[in-house]
Amino acid sequence: VVYGSSILQGASASRPGMAYPARLSRSSGYNFINLGLSGNGKMEKEVAEMLADIDADAFILDCIPNPSPKEITDRTVDFVMTLRQKHPDTPIIVIQTLIRETGNFNQKARENVKRQNEAIAEQVEVLRKKNVKNLYFIKEDQFLGTDHEGTVDGTHPNDLGFDRMLKKYKLAISKILKIKFKAE
């Protein structure tokens, strides 16, 4: 199960099959369920309870674009622990939000993304100190590239942006879940 934002949903992909969960499914043979909730991936307790009812092999939390840094700080531990209660051994993968092109000309947006990524890194560390096992963290690493061609609007990946994200995500996910991905 992959939970997150409009980015995950594939809001600006040329077609639904170009969003990264669909492409992960095609290249692995596993079903990556896309629960991208355009603008609403805010880690609410009720959503955690709903996700916990799903018999999943793994949970990928790619929701950091939507909540504020304060919401991330206030909600992450409870969200992960709600999943962990029903899935004590299931891998949980947390992904930082991608750096948005809009931050190149909007300093407030740039600072918000920086604070979101710092907040989620801090909360993952809190969870690790609580000995939450099978918790993984994918740090933002130029997910969209550096040539300013990976989005349609400075935020949402186009097909090229999804290609670039997918390459980085596949490397991490294949190591964590021991999945072999085929070339697309």
Where do the protein language model's features map onto the residues?
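Histidine-centered active-site loop/cap adjacent to the catalytic His
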Residues: 152-184
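Serine-esterase "nucleophile elbow" of acetyl-processing enzymes
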Residues: 1-37, 41, 45-55
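The substrate-binding groove and active-site-proximal loops of carbohydrate-active enzymes
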Residues: 63-69, 107-113, 152-156
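Oxyanion-hole/transition-state-stabilizing segment in secreted/luminal serine hydrolases
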Residues: 16, 24, 41-86, 97-104
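Loop/turn elements at helix/coil->beta-strand transitions in domains of secreted/extracellular proteins
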Residues: 28-33, 55-58, 88-92, 132-135
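A general structural detector for well-ordered alpha-helical segments in enzyme core domains, enriched
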Residues: 20, 75, 79, 116-123
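Active-site segments of SGNH/GDSL-like serine hydrolases
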Residues: 60-62, 84-115, 138-147
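Substrate-gating cap/lid alpha-helix
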Residues: 100-138, 164, 183
